[in-house]
Regions:
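The catalytic Nudix box helix
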Residues: 39-41, 47-106, 130
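Nudix hydrolase/Nudix homology domain
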Residues: 63-70, 106-208
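A structural signal for short, well-ordered beta-strand segments and their strand-loop junctions
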Residues: 22-23, 86, 97, 101, ...
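A generic short-segment signal for beta-strand/edge and adjacent turn/coil regions
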Residues: 5-8, 94-102, 121-125, 142
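Conserved N-terminal beta-strand and adjoining loop/helix that marks the start
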Residues: 1-22, 27-58
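A generic fold-level signal
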Residues: 4, 16, 31-32, 76-78, ...
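Residue-level marker of positions within ordered structural domains that often coincide
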Residues: 14, 44, 94, 135, ...
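A structural signal for well-ordered alpha-helical segments within the folded catalytic domains
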Residues: 6-7, 79-87, 168-175
Length: 208
């Protein structure tokens, strides 16, 4: 089974003393990863390629997205992943990105990780994880709302989350992004990109 392209977003709130990230619990009705906490996200749809935007991703992010693919990827396809992440963010949490949500500014988005579901699972995804701070996107953290897709939404302290039943890949991505922020609190667009995949039965936690 070939993995489906997907996108997810780590939305970070730095308005308090402790940086927080938005997570929610997947519905028990989901076939793939039910009842675990994850970041907002989902599959890239064909329509995501034609969604409007105000400003593009940074050249560094576009370049890394096109390199982080099992097959040749165009700028349009790479951009569609970012637009898919923002579409899913709105659908699952009610949050709108930027001053003009119908034409989002993609330039604040960083590309921080890529995870490929191992073979043999009921669903397989090739997920690219984006990251952004709420103040950069004009987002009020208090405006989140649950949805059928993502419930029990909460802002989680990025350094104090061991008690939450998070999907293993979600926890790994959060751990690595938290480590990146120690040396680079603003997460520049040139920051490293983690990759998680399985090769010949061995789990690989490497870099792009």
């Amino acid at each position: 089974m070939r993995p489906k392209d997907a996108a997810s977003i780590l939305l970070l709130d730095r308005s308090t003393d402790r940086t927080r990230v938005l997570v929610g619990k997947r519905s028990s009705a989901h076939v793939f990863m039910p009842d675990v906490y994850v970041f907002p996200g989902g599959r890239r749809d064909a329509d995501d390629r034609t969604l409007p935007f105000a400003r593009d991703l940074s050249p560094a992010v576009l370049d890394k997205l096109m390199r982080a693919s099992s097959r040749q990827m165009t700028q349009t396809s790479a951009r569609a992943l970012a637009l898919a992440a923002l579409r899913e963010l709105h659908e699952e949490t009610g949050l709108r990105f930027g001053a003009d949500p119908d034409r989002p500014d993609l330039s604040p988005l960083r590309f921080v990780a890529r995870a490929i579901t191992p073979p043999g699972r009921v669903r397989r995804f090739d997920t690219r994880f984006f990251c952004c701070f709420t103040d950069e996107a004009g987002i009020d953290p208090n405006e989140i709302r649950d949805s059928d897709e993502l419930q029990n939404l909460e802002w989680l302290d990025i350094q104090n989350n061991s008690s939450l039943n998070m999907a293993p890949i979600t926890r790994m991505v959060l751990e690595d992004v938290t480590k990146f922020m120690i040396g680079d609190p603003s997460l520049q667009s040139e920051s490293p990109v983690r990759q998680y995949f399985e090769r010949r039965g061995n789990f690989i936690r490497g870099f792009l």
